[in-house]
């Protein structure tokens, strides 16, 4: 049994957390861990009195929070697209680059040419780097195989990964091939029962799948026992976020072009709005999710990195910082979006908050209070990362 003492402890008290819900901010705090599980939380004075014989790890100058959960990544691919940054700076849009054979199509080519073992090595290295920034659970999608055999291959690689943290697997129906769109959807429907992932996700947008195709795919996935996620309203609004009324979608992601009236549909459905501020930066767009309406209607907000060849960021700390400076979340909202609500978007209710009975996925930060997680930009502030009570990184 171990007691971790900290200058400040911050956690949501419920999952999902909604705007103006209560939050625990405990100064001179302590957490008790036994066998990888949190068994007690309180002030240092309370905890040392209740557990006088436990070992003590004293981080009395530091902040402790739940481990970060990254609920939206595209970690499994080969190659890079750094040349496309110059094209974007010259005025080409993401959609234009994709339609000319770049973007996703370019990454598909690199990924197909890379062996299973090399892809697995790439994936494992990326997960390890994400962990060093405080991520203790990560969602990873397929999506860069394009043809069905390649997508099932990527799903097999995903399921074989050996990782120091938990990996939630998603079969992403990413983008249709340049020709044979109708037949491709039929092939997807046949393949879904064989994916073996936890989630199925569809990129529903102007350059990807339309609403009817997305509805058909997600309905089939739900019937096959998969949980559902959705890329919605990223590049344009074509009606994708309306699907939360019809299907049990755990998380609707991006939402840059979601009309305010659709926020009510999201709120009523219980779907989490997963926002991806790094992508807003890399798309060089002025569009932003309707945050004020989400707050008003108390939609649970999560954030993720959206790591991909288009937004090369494994660092959830950066997502927190940009959620504050680009989207206007408070540091406290951003932290909870990266912990309790990110976990809830994956329906992982055994982590993401610091409470007795929850898994001891925790981060000790080299800062004195939670404000510094956004106030200081650009440094890795994670001092100690704990997965089920075991240290993963210590500086």
UniProtKB/Swiss-Prot annotation:
Origin organism of this chain?
A: Pyrobaculum arsenaticum (strain DSM 13514 / JCM 11321 / PZ6)
Pathway given for this chain reads:
Amino-acid degradation; L-histidine degradation into L-glutamate; N-formimidoyl-L-glutamate from L-histidine: step 3/3
Name the residues that bind Fe(3+): 72, 74, 231, 306
* Swiss-Prot/TrEMBL keywords: Cytoplasm, Histidine metabolism, Hydrolase, Iron, Metal-binding, Zinc
Q: What protein name is recorded for this chain?
A: Imidazolonepropionase
Q: What is its main location?
A: cytoplasm
**Protein encoded by which gene:** hutI
Checking InterPro entries in the record gives:
Amidohydro_3, HutI, Metal-dep_hydrolase_composite, Metal_Hydrolase, MQNX/HUTI_composite_N
Functionally, this protein is described as follows:
Catalyzes the hydrolytic cleavage of the carbon-nitrogen bond in imidazolone-5-propanoate to yield N-formimidoyl-L-glutamate. It is the third step in the universal histidine degradation pathway.
Q: What is the lineage of its organism?
A: Archaea, Thermoproteota, Thermoprotei, Thermoproteales, Thermoproteaceae
Q: What's its EC? A: 3.5.2.7
Q: Where in the cell is it found?
A: Cytoplasm
